[in-house]
């Protein structure tokens, strides 16, 4: 298993993963359908630069992901990360994917 940051080179594998996740567990997804073109567009949009998706990969396929955002408080300079999404395909759960 290896990890990659979501980018334009692996976005198609990411979309395939989302489709599979939607098929297997539609109630776990936060959308009704996968906006493929929207995903591709957001990867090039500077607004989303502070959002990062790390993909867990096996055999050139995405099996899990974590999305997080860095932000800080102006008042005290406190820096933090907010994890907004963690999802691992059911057949890869309980194998340490999310811990890595």
State where each predicted segment sits.
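Conserved GNAT-fold acetyl-CoA-binding loop/helix
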Residues: 2, 22-42
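A short beta-loop-alpha structural element at the N-terminal edge
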Residues: 2-16
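A short helix-loop-beta-strand connector motif used in the catalytic cores of GNAT acetyltransferases and
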Residues: 43-55
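Conserved beta-strand in the GNAT
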Residues: 53-55, 61-70, 82, 87
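A conserved beta-turn-beta hairpin within the catalytic core of GNAT-like acetyltransferases
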Residues: 71-83, 93
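Conserved acetyl-CoA-binding loop-helix of GNAT-fold acetyltransferases
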Residues: 85-88, 94-100
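Alpha-helical elements of Rossmann-like donor-binding domains used by nucleotide-donor carbohydrate transfer enzymes
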Residues: 13-20, 38-41, 100
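Short strand-connecting beta-turns/loops that link adjacent beta-strands
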Residues: 8, 48-49, 59-61
């Amino acid at each position: 298993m290896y990890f990659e940051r979501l980018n334009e080179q692996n976005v198609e594998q990411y979309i395939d993963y989302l489709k599979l996740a939607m098929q297997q567990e539609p109630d776990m997804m936060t959308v009704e359908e996968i906006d493929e073109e929207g995903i591709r567009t957001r990867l090039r949009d500077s607004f989303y630069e502070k959002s990062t998706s790390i993909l867990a990969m096996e055999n050139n396929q995405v099996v899990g992901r974590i999305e997080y955002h860095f932000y800080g408080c102006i008042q005290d300079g406190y820096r933090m990360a907010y994890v907004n999404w963690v999802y691992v395909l059911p057949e890869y759960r309980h194998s340490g994917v999310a811990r890595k």
